[in-house]
């Protein structure tokens, strides 16, 4: 039976209504500081926590409830004779319910230029301690940490048999979930402030919170949720959806891939993408030129895909985009008239992107664990020419473009390009010659000046195939024990080849 409750909340919007319910049920209310004042202002009878502890709040409120008269009242097991005798001997009254919410550490931490001395005061100590104590003793104590549960709990208090052990366990699980999340936020924030921070800590406790529930996952029979990183606001959590249906699991994954690809470039760029694989990447002097060049790489695969830009979409481009069926269009800005044109397609998802990609690490789930690695952000501006045939400044720029593009193609990956536009892409093949054949064959009607490979050539067969299609220069990491064979083949056909010394495998 619930006889005494302790209420201590930072957010006080719903505490009054809940306290009124408790009072109507004859439940004694204990409360702290500002919460007690709020309740008293609303004519609710409250016992200040100092009257229970016989000790004042000290250190400007740092110590309020860290006291045996509070912790003992929460942790005592009602069916344990020794526990209850201890309470009786020490004149400690049991506490049967607590409602606690915590200092808003995250909200303050996410403010710009927050002072560490100020932030430290928003690390709650007493609140998590009470929550953990009550959750540990869930069979005897109701622990409430989520204001969305208050209405249901208020109803159940009127029929106590509904506060069964399973429901209490649910509340306890939720409570420990909150305190673990809260501590994770603090740990990760403090680690990020270190001069020599630990990039890979002993325990992985990255704080993610539920953003929204999706209709389904990758397939209709799979359930899915989107969780966002609490301490950062990345591109996929800060965009504005200006039109269209809700985003699906696949939409978000593909949009993330397209946005990362198009932001690889400083110049005006466009990326057309389907099923997380680029089907066209291009630069242009204008947005429309970049789009037309990217589209022409593979006008078949783009049907039902995504088009991303790193510049404002104008009317001319909007009119072209409207001609085909697309799932998503992404850009940092839209001309007002261009947006009106695109909105004529009611189901077209139009995203206004408010952030460039910011993630430092990426996570891959494997059965029983998670792989964590740094995001592949390394760029090159120079390379080693390993053939007698040298490269002009124009070809050098083309090679650097193709190298950036191939980084975003699933391995084994080959990109053929001309005029800073992909003309053929070979993706996800189990061997490199198949990827090369795919890319070269797709480029043959459009032509290609250079070929980029995400990893080294184990044999000279890719060079032989490239020569058949008139490739002038090749960029690859180098590092194969048979590099000499590929270099000799290039010399045979007058093809320039450069080594970057860096690989760009992409398996997800």
Swiss-Prot record:
<dbReference type="InterPro" id="IPR016193">
    <property type="entry name" value="Cytidine_deaminase-like"/>
</dbReference>
<dbReference type="GO" id="GO:0006189">
    <property type="term" value="P:'de novo' IMP biosynthetic process"/>
</dbReference>
<protein>
    <recommendedName>
        <fullName>Bifunctional purine biosynthesis protein PurH</fullName>
        <ecNumber>2.1.2.3</ecNumber>
        <ecNumber>3.5.4.10</ecNumber>
    </recommendedName>
</protein>
<dbReference type="InterPro" id="IPR002695">
    <property type="entry name" value="PurH-like"/>
</dbReference>
<dbReference type="InterPro" id="IPR036914">
    <property type="entry name" value="MGS-like_dom_sf"/>
</dbReference>
<dbReference type="Pfam" id="PF01808">
    <property type="entry name" value="AICARFT_IMPCHas"/>
</dbReference>
<comment type="pathway">
    <text>Purine metabolism; IMP biosynthesis via de novo pathway; IMP from 5-formamido-1-(5-phospho-D-ribosyl)imidazole-4-carboxamide: step 1/1.</text>
</comment>
<dbReference type="InterPro" id="IPR024051">
    <property type="entry name" value="AICAR_Tfase_dup_dom_sf"/>
</dbReference>
<feature type="domain" description="MGS-like">
    <location>
        <begin position="1"/>
        <end position="145"/>
    </location>
</feature>
<comment type="similarity">
    <text>Belongs to the PurH family.</text>
</comment>
<keyword id="KW-0658">Purine biosynthesis</keyword>
<dbReference type="GO" id="GO:0003937">
    <property type="term" value="F:IMP cyclohydrolase activity"/>
</dbReference>
<keyword id="KW-0378">Hydrolase</keyword>
<dbReference type="Pfam" id="PF02142">
    <property type="entry name" value="MGS"/>
</dbReference>
<keyword id="KW-0511">Multifunctional enzyme</keyword>
<dbReference type="InterPro" id="IPR011607">
    <property type="entry name" value="MGS-like_dom"/>
</dbReference>
<dbReference type="GO" id="GO:0004643">
    <property type="term" value="F:phosphoribosylaminoimidazolecarboxamide formyltransferase activity"/>
</dbReference>
<dbReference type="GO" id="GO:0005829">
    <property type="term" value="C:cytosol"/>
</dbReference>
<keyword id="KW-0808">Transferase</keyword>
<comment type="pathway">
    <text>Purine metabolism; IMP biosynthesis via de novo pathway; 5-formamido-1-(5-phospho-D-ribosyl)imidazole-4-carboxamide from 5-amino-1-(5-phospho-D-ribosyl)imidazole-4-carboxamide (10-formyl THF route): step 1/1.</text>
</comment>
């Amino acid at each position: 039976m619930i006889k005494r409750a302790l209420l201590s909340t930072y957010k006080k919007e719903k505490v009054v209504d809940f306290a009124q319910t408790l009072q109507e049920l004859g439940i004694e209310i204990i409360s702290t500081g500002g919460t007690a004042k709020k309740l008293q202002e609303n004519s609710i009878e409250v016992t200040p926590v100092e009257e229970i502890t016989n000790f004042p709040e000290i250190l400007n409120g740092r110590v309020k409830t860290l006291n045996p008269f509070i912790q003992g009242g929460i942790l005592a097991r009602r069916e344990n004779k020794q526990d209850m005798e201890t309470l009786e001997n020490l004149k400690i009254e049991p506490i049967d319910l607590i409602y606690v919410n915590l200092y808003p550490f995250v909200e303050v931490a996410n403010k710009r230029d927050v002072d560490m001395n100020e932030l430290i005061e928003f690390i709650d100590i007493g609140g998590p301690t009470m929550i953990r104590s009550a959750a540990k003793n869930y069979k005897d104590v109701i622990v409430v940490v989520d204001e969305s549960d208050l209405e249901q709990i208020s109803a159940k208090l009127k029929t106590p048999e509904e506060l069964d052990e399973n429901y209490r366990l649910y509340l306890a699980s939720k409570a420990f979930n909150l305190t673990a999340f809260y501590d994770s936020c603090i740990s990760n924030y403090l680690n990020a402030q270190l001069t020599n921070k630990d990039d890979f800590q002993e325990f992985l406790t990255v704080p993610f919170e539920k953003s929204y529930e999706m209709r389904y996952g990758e397939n209709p029979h799979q359930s899915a949720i989107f969780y966002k990183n609490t301490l950062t606001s990345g591109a996929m959590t800060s965009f504005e959806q200006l039109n269209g249906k809700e985003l699906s699991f696949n939409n978000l994954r593909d949009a993330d891939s397209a946005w990362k690809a198009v932001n690889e470039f400083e110049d005006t760029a466009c990326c057309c993408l389907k099923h997380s694989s680029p089907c066209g990447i291009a630069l242009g002097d204008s947005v429309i030129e970049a789009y037309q060049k990217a589209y022409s790489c593979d006008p078949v695969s783009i049907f039902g895909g995504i088009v991303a830009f790193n510049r404002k979409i104008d009317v001319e481009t909007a009119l072209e985009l409207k001609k085909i069926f697309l799932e998503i269009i992404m850009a940092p800005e839209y001309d007002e008239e261009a947006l009106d044109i695109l909105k004529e397609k009611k189901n077209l998802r139009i995203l206004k992107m408010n952030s460039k990609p910011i993630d430092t690490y990426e996570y891959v789930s494997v059965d029983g664990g998670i792989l964590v690695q740094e995001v592949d952000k390394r760029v090159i501006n120079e390379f080693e020419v390993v053939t007698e045939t040298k490269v002009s400044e124009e070809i050098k720029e083309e090679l650097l473009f193709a190298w950036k593009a191939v980084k975003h193609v699933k391995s084994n990956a080959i990109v053929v390009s001309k005029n800073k536009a992909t003309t053929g892409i070979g993706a996800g093949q189990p061997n490199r010659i198949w990827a090369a054949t795919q890319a070269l064959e797709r480029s043959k009607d459009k032509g290609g000046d250079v070929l980029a490979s995400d990893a080294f050539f184990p044999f000279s067969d890719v060079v032989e195939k490239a020569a058949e299609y008139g490739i002038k220069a090749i960029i690859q990491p180098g590092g194969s024990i048979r590099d000499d064979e590929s270099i000799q083949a290039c010399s045979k056909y007058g093809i320039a080849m450069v080594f970057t010394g860096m690989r760009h495998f992409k398996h997800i």
